[in-house]
């Protein structure tokens, strides 16, 4: 995972699955509902008019990654590197209508997003691909082998 991407986790059936750091078997609508079920509150504050100047809102989420020989789990900031050294701050962005319409499959975006169910409140939309103010890459010191099954746990934190 040496090539920079803004696509952290994408549903296997989504249009952007081939661009993701991790592919998931969950559908965006099911994932959205699961977050509601654990008490997360969606931000739903981004749209095409404000995306490049707005940071996503919604419940703060902790992501923990576990895989074979790493059962204790690793935080997203240990698994994915931000080129600026800023913490990745995943929020429950919401965006269910946009996700259903666009069919990208985006579960977790690495900058704020108006389509992804969750996204990073550290950067506005376009920071990776358009403005190029940040790059995200896998931290190979804390990264599963290619093709290794990974469990990603999302937890609401205050």
Model-derived regions, located:
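Long, low-hydrophobicity ectodomains and other hydrophilic envelope-associated domains
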Residues: 1-158
């Amino acid at each position: 995972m040496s090539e920079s991407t803004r696509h952290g986790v994408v549903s296997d059936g989504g249009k952007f699955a081939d661009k993701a750091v991790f592919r998931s078997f969950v559908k965006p609508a099911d994932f959205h509902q699961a977050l509601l079920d654990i008490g997360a509150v969606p931000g739903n504050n981004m749209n095409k008019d404000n995306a490049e100047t707005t940071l996503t809102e919604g419940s703060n989420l902790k992501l923990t990654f576990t895989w074979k020989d790493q059962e204790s789990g690793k935080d997203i900031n240990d698994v994915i590197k931000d080129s600026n050294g800023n913490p990745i701050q995943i929020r429950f962005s919401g965006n269910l209508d946009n996700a259903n319409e666009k069919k990208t499959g985006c579960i977790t975006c690495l900058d704020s997003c108006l389509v992804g169910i969750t996204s990073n409140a550290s950067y506005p939309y376009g920071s990776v691909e358009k403005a190029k103010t940040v790059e995200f890459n896998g931290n190979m010191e804390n990264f599963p082998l290619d093709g290794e099954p990974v469990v990603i746990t999302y937890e609401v934190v205050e």
